[in-house]
């Protein structure tokens, strides 16, 4: 079955600075049977008016308005309104890249998910075909050694992009809008539990502007470890369903969460209080593998002087020192 009739869902919250770019990128060379659903998530600025303006300018664009509920809730509103055979999620501060529609024209597949590559402003190109040949894969086990990097190293399988979902298979599946983080990871895991196959498309067709100030990757938050705990049972169930031992993947998931949470604490500004920082550092250092990985990373840190307190705090398991240093550094630098 060829790829036609795609619904693109764009959740919008205070997105007036980037939304035109996102919509223009989706419309470039797009087929007439494609639809774009702009979901204004109760934005307090002029985002809602811009959604209406863009919808008035092209019949393929529809503006939807809802009370603020977060990205997951906004995506759910889009899913409820979608009519396409396929669904593609695009963030309002990101963009689709030229060539996607022509590449999809050449795809004939019965798979329920089509996965392609993205480029991040911070790190460059990542695509599934860096790890395995293009084509259809019957289940996760068929991905072999590519599964772990696609899940954890690149996040290509875990994020709601860069991919298409067959809407018929989605059925009533929705994002858990009670979660503040990882609701997209849980959504993908749940979809993979009910889907048949994955098609890996060669090419980079999604651009993620992850260095902009509103990006989650640049905001200090303290819930990454809790979020990983919430999604771990669903991940284990998915892996068992595909005949895989979940233990090594659970270990990697936990290690990644520890390293990412450490990175946010050490590298991002925010108003997280000392007690919460200390508790998070203590939990990270209690994981021996995470502590060893951090020691190795800090040995190679190019910021020699600034890294000294981190090296001491990690080596001597002093979470209080690490918490205090991050606060002091934030105030002085």
Segments and roles (model prediction):
Residues 71, 92-202, 206-224:
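Donor-binding/catalytic cores of nucleotide-activated saccharide
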Residues 87:
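Short aromatic/hydrophobic "clamp" motif used to bind/position activated sugar donors
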Residues 1-25:
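N-proximal low-complexity "stem/linker" segments adjacent to membrane-targeting elements
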Residues 40-50, 67-68:
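A conserved acidic beta->alpha catalytic loop
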Residues 24-33:
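Short, acidic, metal-binding catalytic loop of nucleotide-sugar glycosyltransferases
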Residues 66-82:
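Glycine-rich, basic loop-to-helix element that forms the pyrophosphate-binding segment
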Residues 18-20, 45-54, 95, 99:
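Acidic helix N-cap motif at the loop->helix transition within catalytic regions
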Residues 267-333:
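Membrane-interface aromatic/basic loop that binds lipid-linked glycans or pyrophosphate carriers
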